[in-house]
């Protein structure tokens, strides 16, 4: 027979959940994909999810022979993070309700802070929409610049968009809004509570966990030969066929010695095109270094899929994923964007960053003498609390655990804003 859980411990767990729910700022705005235990075990903790398809338009009455094959790409979603808070409670400490409340808040703060930090770092390092401001962001125009960038790319305006501002930026924007002669409660809320609310088409959130984007070493780096990416659903290795992650590509350059993951660059002549209509936005596409793979190769986001290669290096179906005007030219010099370190404010189209929620098979029948409680939070993450103690020591060991993964499902629909030069 499994041990029963003391009332004090049950109340403590409820308090942890309540505090955790109140602190998961970014996770609450992300998409949640629950991966069940059996799927996780049978797929080595990774499943492939379909990327949004883009249609191809043919004009005219007779479209004989113009049919386009369906090319559906996929993105890997993985469980890879186990966060824990472990501590002991004595029989004396269990008597004090206020002590238990404080420890519950500390536990929830630790777990939620780690989740928020991981999400902020993911977008800060992989989001490809980089809005580099001439001065520190301070008002409506800065958020409006993000809105304009997303609109030019035809990122759906009917979907919710969110921006997560570092505290200093949030307060500067609150001050700007408080000085506006606007209708409604926003100026008063900004003045009294430093609250912005819905601002320039975005839900705004004040955060204290946004990272700093370091300054790039800015080495002189050139592209080795003309390069672009051909969207392909699958790849074959050693006779095995499996999905291909098309979010990025390998770029070969003259050298990578001082380049770092997270660096931002543009390529002369390589301009953005909008996702649906394929209009030239007249803005250089910003790229992120995701990883350094060798002395001359690096993985970058997003992939370079040139509009002018349709019918040549790309089929029409592959061309539906075009995101730039032309390929990276041979010998083109990379222009580094983050020439100065700057505090990041991140933004996204809701649903483009995902929390993969996992489960761990823990129960009292498997671990004799231990008690387990589990609950799924509103952010989709399951919190498990394990307790184990002995009367001889008068001490209860407590372990709080969550298991999840984070994935930037579409780096072309999220990014960062700040002063990086």
Regions found by a protein language model. Give the residues of each.
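Short beta-strand segments
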Residues: 47, 85, 285-287
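Short acidic, glycine/tyrosine-flanked loop/strand segments centered on an H-E-D-like triad
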Residues: 70-95
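Core alpha/beta structural scaffold of self-assembling particle/tube/pore-forming proteins
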Residues: 97-100, 104, 108-421
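Extracytoplasmic
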Residues: 44, 82, 393-395
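N-terminal "assembly arms/tails" that initiate or stabilize quaternary assembly
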Residues: 1-74, 414-415
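Short, conserved beta-strand segments within well-ordered enzyme catalytic domains
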Residues: 48-50, 88, 164
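Disorder-to-helix initiation segments
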Residues: 5-9, 92-96, 100
């Amino acid at each position: 027979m499994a041990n029963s859980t003391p009332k004090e411990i049950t109340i403590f767990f409820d308090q942890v959940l309540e505090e955790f729910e109140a602190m998961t700022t970014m996770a609450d705005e992300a998409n949640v994909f629950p991966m069940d235990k059996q799927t996780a075990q049978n797929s080595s903790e990774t499943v492939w999810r379909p990327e949004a398809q883009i249609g191809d338009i043919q004009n005219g009455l007779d479209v004989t022979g113009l049919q386009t094959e369906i090319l559906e790409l996929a993105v890997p979603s993985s469980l890879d993070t186990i966060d824990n808070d472990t501590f002991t409670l004595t029989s004396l400490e269990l008597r004090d309700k206020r002590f238990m409340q404080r420890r519950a808040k500390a536990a929830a703060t630790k777990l939620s802070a780690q989740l928020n930090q991981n999400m902020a770092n993911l977008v800060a390092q992989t989001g490809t929409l980089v809005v580099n401001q001439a001065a520190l962001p301070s008002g409506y125009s800065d958020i409006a610049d993000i809105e304009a960038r997303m609109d030019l790319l035809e990122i759906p305006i009917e979907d919710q968009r969110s921006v997560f501002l570092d505290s200093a930026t949030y307060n500067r924007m609150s001050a700007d809004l408080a000085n506006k002669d606007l209708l409604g409660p926003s100026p008063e809320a900004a003045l009294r509570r430093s609250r912005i609310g819905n601002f320039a088409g975005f839900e705004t959130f004040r955060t204290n966990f946004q990272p700093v984007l370091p300054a790039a070493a800015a080495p002189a780096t050139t592209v080795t030969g003309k390069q672009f990416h051909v969207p392909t659903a699958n790849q074959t290795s050693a006779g095995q066929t499996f999905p291909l992650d098309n979010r990025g590509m390998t770029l070969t350059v003259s050298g990578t010695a001082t380049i770092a993951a997270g660096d931002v660059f543009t390529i002369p002549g390589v301009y953005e095109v909008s996702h649906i209509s394929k209009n030239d936005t007249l803005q250089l596409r910003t790229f992120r270094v995701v990883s350094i793979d060798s002395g001359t190769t690096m993985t970058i986001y997003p992939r370079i899929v040139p509009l002018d290669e349709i019918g040549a290096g790309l089929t029409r179906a592959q061309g539906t994923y075009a995101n730039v005007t032309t390929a990276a030219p041979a010998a083109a010099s990379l222009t580094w964007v983050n020439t100065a370190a700057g505090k990041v404010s991140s933004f996204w189209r809701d649903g483009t960053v995902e929390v993969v929620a996992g489960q761990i098979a823990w129960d009292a029948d498997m671990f004799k003498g231990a008690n387990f409680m589990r609950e799924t939070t509103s952010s989709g993450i399951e919190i498990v609390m394990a307790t184990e103690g002995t009367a001889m020591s008068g001490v209860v060991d407590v372990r709080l655990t969550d298991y999840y993964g984070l994935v930037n499902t579409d780096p072309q629909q999220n990014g960062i804003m700040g002063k990086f030069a």
